[in-house]
């Protein structure tokens, strides 16, 4: 799944940038952020671009 980050407050993600969701775990998205590390993020911070 591809998602676009729609918030401004996270230093490891870029506003309006598209990210690939590696997996969905307990309702959160596992995404590789701009530092190259993967973390869990809240779905409400993203807009789904492609399922």
Annotate each PLM feature:
Residues 2-45, 49-50:
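Basic/aromatic-rich interaction segments and small domains that mediate binding to polyanionic partners
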């Amino acid at each position: 799944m591809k998602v676009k980050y729609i918030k401004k407050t996270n230093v490891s993600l870029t506003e309006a940038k598209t990210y690939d969701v590696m997996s969905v775990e307990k309702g959160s998205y596992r995404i590789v952020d701009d530092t190259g590390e993967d973390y869990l993020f809240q779905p409400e911070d993203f807009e789904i671009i492609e399922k």
